[in-house]
Amino acid sequence: MQSLIAAIVALVVVAIIAIVVWSIVFIEYRKILRQRKIDRLIDRIRERAEDSGNESEGDQEELSALVEMGHDAPWDIDDL
Protein backbone atom coordinates (compact mmCIF):
# COMPACT_ATOMS: atom_id res chain seq x y z
CA MET A 1 0.00 0.00 0.00
CA GLN A 2 2.83 2.38 0.81
CA SER A 3 4.46 1.72 -2.54
CA LEU A 4 1.22 2.76 -4.26
CA ILE A 5 1.13 6.00 -2.29
CA ALA A 6 4.80 6.64 -3.07
CA ALA A 7 4.17 6.03 -6.77
CA ILE A 8 1.23 8.46 -6.80
CA VAL A 9 3.25 11.11 -4.95
CA ALA A 10 6.13 10.61 -7.40
CA LEU A 11 3.78 11.04 -10.37
CA VAL A 12 2.37 14.24 -8.90
CA VAL A 13 5.87 15.62 -8.28
CA VAL A 14 6.96 14.71 -11.82
CA ALA A 15 3.83 16.38 -13.24
CA ILE A 16 4.52 19.58 -11.30
CA ILE A 17 8.16 19.64 -12.43
CA ALA A 18 7.09 19.06 -16.05
CA ILE A 19 4.60 21.93 -15.88
CA VAL A 20 7.24 24.29 -14.45
CA VAL A 21 9.86 23.29 -17.03
CA TRP A 22 7.49 23.62 -20.00
CA SER A 23 6.25 26.96 -18.69
CA ILE A 24 9.83 28.24 -18.64
CA VAL A 25 10.42 26.87 -22.15
CA PHE A 26 7.26 28.60 -23.42
CA ILE A 27 8.26 31.94 -21.87
CA GLU A 28 11.74 31.75 -23.41
CA TYR A 29 10.26 30.79 -26.78
CA ARG A 30 8.02 33.87 -26.70
CA LYS A 31 11.05 36.02 -25.88
CA ILE A 32 12.91 34.60 -28.87
CA LEU A 33 9.95 35.24 -31.19
CA ARG A 34 9.63 38.79 -29.92
CA GLN A 35 13.34 39.42 -30.43
CA ARG A 36 13.13 38.08 -33.99
CA LYS A 37 10.24 40.45 -34.70
CA ILE A 38 12.26 43.38 -33.31
CA ASP A 39 15.26 42.37 -35.42
CA ARG A 40 13.12 42.20 -38.57
CA LEU A 41 11.71 45.66 -37.88
CA ILE A 42 15.19 47.10 -37.31
CA ASP A 43 16.38 45.55 -40.58
CA ARG A 44 13.36 46.99 -42.40
CA ILE A 45 14.01 50.45 -40.96
CA ARG A 46 17.66 50.30 -41.97
CA GLU A 47 16.77 49.08 -45.46
CA ARG A 48 14.22 51.84 -46.00
CA ALA A 49 16.59 54.45 -44.60
CA GLU A 50 19.23 53.38 -47.12
CA ASP A 51 16.73 53.42 -49.98
CA SER A 52 14.98 56.70 -49.28
CA GLY A 53 17.46 58.71 -47.27
CA ASN A 54 15.16 58.97 -44.26
CA GLU A 55 13.74 56.53 -41.77
CA SER A 56 10.23 55.17 -41.91
CA GLU A 57 8.08 56.67 -39.16
CA GLY A 58 5.55 53.83 -39.23
CA ASP A 59 8.18 51.19 -38.62
CA GLN A 60 9.76 53.22 -35.84
CA GLU A 61 6.39 53.62 -34.14
CA GLU A 62 5.74 49.90 -34.45
CA LEU A 63 9.19 49.14 -33.05
CA SER A 64 8.81 51.53 -30.12
CA ALA A 65 5.39 50.05 -29.34
CA LEU A 66 6.85 46.56 -29.50
CA VAL A 67 9.82 47.40 -27.31
CA GLU A 68 7.57 49.54 -25.05
CA MET A 69 10.15 52.28 -24.70
CA GLY A 70 10.04 56.00 -25.28
CA HIS A 71 13.28 55.84 -27.24
CA ASP A 72 12.42 55.54 -30.94
CA ALA A 73 15.78 54.13 -32.05
CA PRO A 74 17.23 51.72 -29.46
CA TRP A 75 20.39 51.20 -31.51
CA ASP A 76 21.16 54.96 -31.54
CA ILE A 77 22.38 55.69 -28.02
CA ASP A 78 23.74 59.21 -27.55
CA ASP A 79 22.79 59.71 -23.91
CA LEU A 80 25.64 57.82 -22.25
From Swiss-Prot:
Residues 52-62 have a biased composition (Acidic residues). GO terms for biological process: receptor catabolic process; symbiont-mediated suppression of host innate immune response; symbiont-mediated suppression of host type I interferon-mediated signaling pathway; symbiont-mediated-mediated suppression of host tetherin activity; viral release from host cell. Keywords: AIDS, Apoptosis, Host membrane, Host-virus interaction, Inhibition of host innate immune response by virus, Inhibition of host tetherin by virus, Ion channel, Ion transport, Membrane, Phosphoprotein, Transmembrane, Transmembrane helix, Transport, Viral immunoevasion. It is found in: Host membrane. Residues 49-80 are annotated as: Disordered. The modification Phosphoserine is found at residues 52, 56. It holds the Pfam family Vpu. This is Protein Vpu. The gene is vpu.
